[in-house]
């Protein structure tokens, strides 16, 4: 399973090849998009990218956790976390790719 990790440089290269911008312009475009997404998330806004996913910030209340080594109860402070929820379109594409790969390996 798994494969390679896609980096910013990979995204820049893909924009360069598919859109036809220069590498410098492609890098600037990728950075602008990522900055906009990050700024929105940091400001508590929901980012919904149709057919891809929704990024959302959630508040988690304080709760009691347990130290796994000692069993001692430890308070876990309230915090904000980001959630990623894949769209149904993306989930379906992942499932289809998985089924396609399963079909190749079972022959």
From Swiss-Prot:
Signal peptide bounds: none
CDD domains linked: IHF_A (cd13835)
SUPFAM superfamilies per UniProt: IHF-like DNA-binding proteins
InterPro entries assigned to the protein according to its UniProt record, in alphabetical order: Hist_DNA-bd, Histone-like_DNA-bd_CS, IHF-like_DNA-bd_dom_sf, IHF_alpha
Gene Ontology MF annotations: DNA binding; structural constituent of chromatin
UniProt xrefs under Pfam families: Bac_DNA_binding
Domain of life of the organism encoding this protein: Bacteria
GO cellular component term of the entry, any: cytosol
Gene3D superfamilies hit by this protein: IHF-like DNA-binding proteins
Keyword Heme tagged: no
A biological process from GO: regulation of DNA-templated transcription
Assembly mode: Heterodimer of an alpha and a beta chain.
Function: This protein is one of the two subunits of integration host factor, a specific DNA-binding protein that functions in genetic recombination as well as in transcriptional and translational control.
Family from the record: Belongs to the bacterial histone-like protein family.
Name used for this protein in its record: Integration host factor subunit alpha
Species assigned in the record: Brucella suis (strain ATCC 23445 / NCTC 10510)
